[in-house]
Amino acid sequence: LYATALAEGYTLASVVNDAPIVYTDPVTGVTWRPQNDSKKFYGPTRLRVSLTRSQNMVTIRLLQAIGVKKFINFMEQLGFSRDKFPPYLSTALGAAQVTPLEMASGYCIFANGGNRVIPHLIKKIQDYQGNLIYEAPPPASIPTLNPHVSFLITSALQDAIQNGTGRRAKSLGRNDLAGKTGTTND
């Protein structure tokens, strides 16, 4: 979602309000009151800080401003199937039905400077004597995302590890980590 926002002209310094949101479904009458994990609200927040802290209200407002349809189209350009993304604001909080492999492939686009690499599970097969039976061709690198956007998202995801919700990963002793935490029931 944040990559979509950057591609649409937002910056990591753009400010979005982290404040309570309440939606009532006009058909069912069900009320939705999403929360931040901390149960706190922080007011006007830069996107970099929001991503680092995993602030749900900013993320929902960002999706609302960009438009769910535009976001789903962007995800399709990144290689995801559009039918995995429900056309609702809860998609901002992770309501998409993607597999761990699909999610890892999506994040690899950032690690590869905006290029998508189609994953393969089997690199090669050898018989018991070491004779090669099968070897996967080198994966193609498909330009998918503006390298500038990729760099900025990677930088923000590194902040999430260094200073944000993913800081426990620093115990691995590596300085090249980037990541995003978060789960939802919304």
Please place each PLM-identified region on the residue numbering.
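Poly-acidic low-complexity segments
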Residues: 4, 11, 65-67, 146
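A penicillin-recognizing enzyme superfamily signal
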Residues: 11-12, 49, 53, 99-186
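Short acidic, glycine/proline-rich loop/turn micro-motifs
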Residues: 29, 86-89, 135-138
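Short, glycine/proline-biased beta-turn/loop segments that scaffold the active-site neighborhood
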Residues: 1-44, 118-132
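Active-site-adjacent helix/loop patches that line small-molecule binding or acyl-intermediate pockets
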Residues: 16-21, 35-80, 85-112, 156-159
